[in-house]
Structures are given as structure tokens and as C-alpha cells.
Amino acid sequence: MEQALGRVPALQTAGVKMLTNGPESFTPDGNFILGEAPELKNFYVRAGFNAYGIAAGGGAGMALAEWVANAGPPYDLWAVDIRRFGRPHFDTDWVRARTYKAYGKHYTMAWARRRA
């Protein structure tokens, strides 16, 4: 906080007195996880937003609410559907390596023809 006050003196009189940094959750493919857990009926997941939680939260919440109410996704949500991960993805080493890679690319420039 002291460093922030040094850079922006106006913060001394602002209402901000404490900064809080929360943990982020990233997924192996960089897409968030949404939908009913395949192994647990009526248990819905909305997680792993890869730092897009605020930006995607409203739409993801609406989509999941419709999913719960209508017993299925309201439109094609396969890119974020929890079912896209299966037994082959249970390998902890693979998940860790892919998640680190997704995190590392999160803020990079999205160039055309760049390999994933």
C-alpha cells in the first residue's frame, strides 16, 4: 500500500485503505468450467475462470441458471463444458503442465497461426 501511495498520492485521501489480492484459478485449456458434474447428479460447477471471472461472470451465471432450470445447456457451451475433461485428463502431471502453459499464455498477444 505504501508503494501505491508513493506512486499515486491522491490515494492518501481516497476511501481505499487496503488492497486484497485473491487467488486465481486456471484450467489446462484456458477455458473456464461450467455445467453439471458427470459423476454427481444435480451438482453444478462454475469455476476456473482464468482471470475472466468479472468479465464472464454475468453471462456464465445466466447460462448456468438456464442450464439448471432446463436440465441442459441453453446453447452450445462445449468449449467450457465440464464434460470436455474425462479420464485421460486425470493425470496430475499433465494437468499441472498444461495449466502452467495456459497461465503463461494468458496475457500474451493472440497472433494468427500461432500454435496452441
Locate predicted features.
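C-terminal catalytic lobe of FAD-dependent flavoproteins
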Residues: 1-102, 108-114
